[in-house]
Amino acid sequence: MDLDEPRITGNIKEIKTGKRIDNLDMNKIMPDFFKTETENLKIINNSKNVLKKLSKFLQIIVLTNLPHKDKNKRVKALQRNDMNFPVITNSGLKGEAVKKILDKTKIKVKSFFIDDMPLNIDSVSKESSDTVCIHFIQDKRIKKLMPTPKSATISFHNWLDIENFILDNLNDDGEKETQ
């Protein structure tokens, strides 16, 4: 994989030839990848412990743009890592889904949204302006290609910083901070 741009299509190369895989081939490869590898994806450093700790104070929900038919594979992968959180599959921008989730709560709650994709951060910020939007990219190679969107409350590169930020901001008035 080359990381010339912050996307998968165009950055995947054939191992033997080094030739980039074109869009039509990617449309065939990606469904197979989700089908065979979703259950095998490794968790990110510190994510398990941080989410378990935060779950004492917050309802953790995994909102993923994984194909709906592969949802149970994601659930199994999380459960295998002792991360028993609800999983909701989505297609497209995540703002509307977050708004629907929050609209279902009977009381006003403090909400945090963590994502790597700037368009999802923008979408959630627009649809649910009270939500604290955290732009998270752990891989420094990708961070160089994907700047933090202006709509993000803050940006982090590791889960321990996210944990500290959320714990520090559970009971404040939700004013956006910059860093």
Language-model region placement:
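Short, acidic loop-to-helix structural element flanking the phosphoryl-transfer center
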Residues: 20-23, 31-61, 68-75
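Short acidic-hydrophobic, aromatic-tinged amphipathic segments that line or gate anion-handling sites
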Residues: 86-92, 153-161
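Short, charged, surface-exposed secondary-structure boundary motifs
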Residues: 95-100, 142-151, 165-167
